[in-house]
Amino acid sequence: MNKTLYQKIYDSHIIHEEKNNTSILYIDLHLLHEVTSPQAFYSLRQKRRMVRQPKKTFATMDHNVSTHNRDINGSGSMAKIQMEQLRKNCDEFNISLYDINNPNQGIVHVIAPEKGMTLPGMTIVCGDSHTSTHGAFGALSFGIGTSEVEHVLATQTLKQQRFKNMKIEIIGQIPKFISAKDIILFIIGKXGSSIGSGYVVEFCGNVIETMSMEERMTICNMAIEMGAKSGLIAPDKTTYAYLKNKIYSPYGVFWEKSLDFWQTLKSDKDAFFDKIFTIDISNLAPQITWGTNPDQVISIDEKIPNYETFSSLTQRNLAKSACKYMGLKKESYLTNISIDKVFIGSXTNARIEDLRLAAKILKNKKISNNVQAIVVPGSGSVKRQAEREGLDKIFINAGFEWRLPGCSMCLGMNRDRLNVGERCASXSNRNFEGRQGRGGRT
């Protein structure tokens, strides 16, 4: 039987298969952060259980950390408790931790790939929805809940149903000024935020083949925004070049053996997909969200749609509600709307290539005095590389604040947040109501 990439990885990790299309899978890598892990460790202690595979478990502090300084008190009392608890848990259970004082600390979905922890063919889980990022390497990766975090800690396994297979082939020539973020926003905008529900999505096509690993990570990061369980991209020479000589990558004879295996990680020629879409992005314009859902997307030169013309009553009501929350009028242009803040960062767009692109646009320019703008590198490694290249100076000279690594304004769990009614142009992945702060407009 010919198999898809998803089926190959799933099948190779089955420990026990049940009759209802559900299996117990072995988990190769378990990523932790300070927000969704405390209850799991508490439960382990209550049941007097140990962590099954500490060497296959890695933790960092990212959601709550202050990007102003490395003071553990910098994001409030609750954040301090969670970070202190993670430190205690990792020490007790012998788990590697990049805490706030580690020079390599940063966003978990930035650190794991850049250090070579994320490898093709792996199963990877984390108590965070954007774990799909790691699918860019041909790894089956997805977010899990806190009770599942506990189960993986205790057993290094997880019960998972089989999902259907979707293929999205992206073709054409990438227009000037178009990024991977524009491409995935366009796909979500056209297909909807639930089109991937019940599926693992494999992205392919000549556009994907020409992308760097960091661009591919942006694509897979937002697979969850189209409702998918995860996103996948088959590994290729670009993947291998990125991983070579990383700290946790295989080396020597193990590298050669890994390459032999990785080259088998692709969908067979006649593998069956439940749904297939082909999308030509040759004429794509820059994309921007206008509402409170990732599929409420338009080109930057388009008007906000007239929701009265929508055939679906549900979509009409959602769009009307979004316009009200965002303080926008139908059939108006977003280019005429002033903003209060700008955020460059997040697990979607805080890598070195993202910062290079932003710095190229900002060089010799100055932002308005009425706008607060911040740049938050995705990790200590990204920050140091950007500073070696002088990108920090470009941002600072343009009027941006150059911050320390963390999740920052991607979500309102730290001191970086929007005030009620403020508008933010954000490089993050979600524009939900209150996502960046109560009453904030993304």
UniProtKB/Swiss-Prot annotation:
Q: Which reaction does it catalyse?
A: (2R,3S)-3-isopropylmalate = (2S)-2-isopropylmalate
Give the required cofactors.
Answer: [4Fe-4S] cluster
Broadest EC class assigned to this enzyme? lyase
Extract the PANTHER family matched here.
3-ISOPROPYLMALATE DEHYDRATASE, HOMOACONITASE, MITOCHONDRIAL-RELATED
* Free-text cofactor note: Binds 1 [4Fe-4S] cluster per subunit.
Instruction: Print the keywords alphabetically.
Output: 4Fe-4S, Amino-acid biosynthesis, Branched-chain amino acid biosynthesis, Iron, Iron-sulfur, Leucine biosynthesis, Lyase, Metal-binding, Plasmid
EC assignment: the record states: 4.2.1.33
Instruction: Give the superkingdom in one word.
Output: Bacteria
- UniProt-annotated binding residues for [4Fe-4S] cluster: 347, 407, 410
Question: What is the role of the protein in this entry?
Answer: Catalyzes the isomerization between 2-isopropylmalate and 3-isopropylmalate, via the formation of 2-isopropylmaleate.
Mind telling me what this protein is named?
Answer: 3-isopropylmalate dehydratase large subunit
**According to the entry, what is the taxonomic lineage of the organism?**
Bacteria, Pseudomonadati, Pseudomonadota, Gammaproteobacteria, Enterobacterales
Pfam families for this protein: Aconitase (PF00330)
Q: What is any one GO biological process for this UniProt entry?
A: L-leucine biosynthetic process
InterPro entries assigned: 3-IsopropMal_deHydase_lsu, Acnase/IPM_dHydase_lsu_aba_1/3, Acoase/IPM_deHydtase_lsu_aba, Aconitase_4Fe-4S_BS, Aconitase_4Fe-4S_dom, IPM_dehydratase_rel_enz, IPMI_cat
Q: Which SUPFAM superfamilies match?
A: Aconitase iron-sulfur domain (SSF53732)
The source organism is: Buchnera aphidicola subsp. Macrosiphoniella ludovicianae
Summary of subunit composition and partner proteins: Heterodimer of LeuC and LeuD.
Q: In which pathway does it act?
A: Amino-acid biosynthesis; L-leucine biosynthesis; L-leucine from 3-methyl-2-oxobutanoate: step 2/4
UniProt record similarity statement: Belongs to the aconitase/IPM isomerase family. LeuC type 1 subfamily.
Gene Ontology MF annotations:
3-isopropylmalate dehydratase activity; 4 iron, 4 sulfur cluster binding; metal ion binding
